[in-house]
Curated annotation (Swiss-Prot):
Record keywords: Cell membrane, Cytoplasm, Cytoplasmic vesicle, Membrane, Phosphoprotein, Ubl conjugation
Chain intervals for the UniProt region annotation (Disordered): 127-171, 274-294
Places the protein is found: Cell membrane; Cytoplasmic vesicle, Secretory vesicle membrane; Cytoplasm
PTM description: Phosphorylated on serine and threonine residues. Phosphorylated on tyrosine. Phosphorylation of Tyr-224 and Tyr-227 are required for ubiquitination.
Name recorded for this polypeptide: Sprouty-related, EVH1 domain-containing protein 2
Biased composition range(s): Polar residues: 146-156
GO MF entry, a single one: stem cell factor receptor binding
GO CC terms in record: cytoplasmic vesicle; plasma membrane; transport vesicle membrane
Subunit note: Homodimer and heterodimer. Able to interact with SPRED1 to form heterodimers. Interacts with RAS. May interact with ZDHHC13 (via ANK repeats) and ZDHHC17 (via ANK repeats). Interacts with TESK1. Interacts with NF1.
Record Pfam families: Sprouty (PF05210), WH1 (PF00568)
Function field: Negatively regulates Ras signaling pathways and downstream activation of MAP kinases. Recruits and translocates NF1 to the cell membrane, thereby enabling NF1-dependent hydrolysis of active GTP-bound Ras to inactive GDP-bound Ras. Inhibits fibroblast growth factor (FGF)-induced retinal lens fiber differentiation, probably by inhibiting FGF-mediated phosphorylation of ERK1/2. Inhibits TGFB-induced epithelial-to-mesenchymal transition in lens epithelial cells.
Membrane topology: Peripheral membrane protein
Entry comment describing in which tissues the protein is expressed: Expressed in the eye, with higher expression in lens epithelium than in lens fiber cells at postnatal day 15.
Organism, as annotated: Rattus norvegicus
């Protein structure tokens, strides 16, 4: 890119990490722009290039490793945006084509919402919109794509002698951990051996539960975990190895030790008896190796990569999750015939085509597509059952009787 502009960080309405792609019409494929590499791509509000005093929107991409501007494209009302797949979107302005390969479907959806928001503001003529497209209902705790620093910048934590601050990888809320020492050092001499104790750690906001951790491994959690990596907290808290320390999660006071030891009557021990026969073989129960799902706990879905609440997770909440009813409807109604016809006859150079039953009148092939579907229904009459079955399925999704459910990542 010859002309470089550096918009203010506050002017972005959405910003994600992606690989900028360029279209090669000679070979009919997409290739990385300027040698590839992860770039910070966002939609920001800038002054209109024509200098008429009005504001416009610019899609700005800057490669991370060398700060090279690899993408600059002004958003226009006639911008044609295509979602080829969940992680690759491309658009066309005049005769120029741009594409982005996102790192996750959540990034792609956030960028799509940002572009649509910019186009709506241009159509309405109001570019003073200060509302951001992010809200807690659509995005999770980790889906904040505005100017946020990487997790590596927050990984340094100050070590204190008695108080440490850590944060959960699924939340930015910080908590204090207080280590209670039941044996003060002032009461013992240096040469006196201290009795062995188990340090008690209290998390005031979590439910009461005993889990094991390995004290030989130092765990330092950062304040902002990358959602593409497995959570560190679940890795260490689910360990079943024997440990010398116990961590207790409690709301109030720390209860007493829950281990119960069997009582043996003193009459069983006599002179001349074999002491091996009186060995107590009962062992204390082991702590649970799996944490139960707490009330209001949020996890990330493996299908759509969005955060969800386990208590509110019902059918129809995840559009990307497998839906057996929807798959059965498409097979019974032979919709694969319509998909094959549209792919071979009405697809664009990238192989994308409109949904067979779409009612979008802005499509150039709207009338031709429906006429072809009507003609095809005479050869496959079962296609006429698709619309009624799809309407029933939609009602079932609204009633939470069918549809896909979120699935927590392991």
């Amino acid at each position: 890119m010859t002309e470089e502009t550096h918009p203010d960080d506050d002017s972005y309405i959405v910003r994600v990490k992606a690989v900028v792609m360029t279209r090669d019409d000679s070979s009919g494929g997409w290739f990385p722009q300027e040698g590839g590499g992860i770039s910070r791509v966002g939609v920001c509000k800038v002054m209109h290039p024509e200098g008429n005093g009005r504001s416009g929107f610019l899609i700005h991409g800057e490669r991370q490793k060398d700060k090279l501007v690899v993408l600059e494209c002004y958003v226009r009302k006639d911008l044609v945006y295509t979602k080829a797949n969940p992680t690759f979107h491309h658009w066309k302005v005049d005769n120029r084509k741009f594409g982005l390969t996102f790192q996750s479907p959540a990034d792609a959806r956030a960028f799509d919402r940002g572009v649509r928001k910019a186009i709506e503001d241009l159509i309405e003529g109001s570019t003073t919109s200060s509302s951001t497209i992010h809200n807690e209902a659509e995005l999770g705790d980790d889906d904040v794509f505005t100017t946020a620093t990487d997790s590596s910048s927050n990984s340094s934590q100050k070590r204190e002698p008695n108080t440490r601050t850590i944060s959960s990888p699924t939340s930015c809320e910080h908590r204090r951990i207080y280590t209670l020492d039941p044996y003060p050092m002032d009461l013992y001499h240096p040469d006196q051996r201290l009795p062995r104790s188990y340090p008690q750690v209290t998390f005031p906001e979590d439910d009461e539960e005993i889990v094991r951790i390995n004290p030989r491994e130092k765990i330092w959690m950062t304040g902002y975990e990358d959602y593409r990596h497995a959570p560190v907290r679940g890795k260490y808290l689910d360990s079943t190895e024997d440990a010398d320390s116990y961590v207790r999660f409690a709301k109030g006071e720390v209860p007493k030790h829950e281990y119960t030891y069997p009582y043996v009557d003193s009459s069983d021990f006599g002179f001349g008896e074999d002491p091996k026969g009186n060995v107590i073989k009962t062992q204390p129960p082991r702590a649970k190796s799996r944490r139960r799902k707490e009330n209001g706990e949020r996890s990330r879905c493996v299908y759509c990569r969005d955060m969800f609440n386990h208590e509110e997770n019902r059918r129809g909440h995840c559009q990307d999750a497998p839906d057996a009813v929807r798959t059965c409807i498409r097979r019974v109604s032979c919709m694969w015939c319509a998909d094959s016809m549209l792919y071979h006859c009405m697809s664009d150079p990238e192989g994308d085509y409109t949904d067979p039953c779409s009612c979008d009148t802005s499509d150039e092939k709207f009338c031709l597509r429906w006429m072809a579907l009507i003609a095809l229904s005479f050869l496959a009459p079962c296609m006429c059952c698709y619309l009624p079955l799809r309407a029933c399925h939609h009602c079932g999704v609204m009633c939470r009787c069918c549809g896909g459910k979120h699935k927590a990542a392991a």
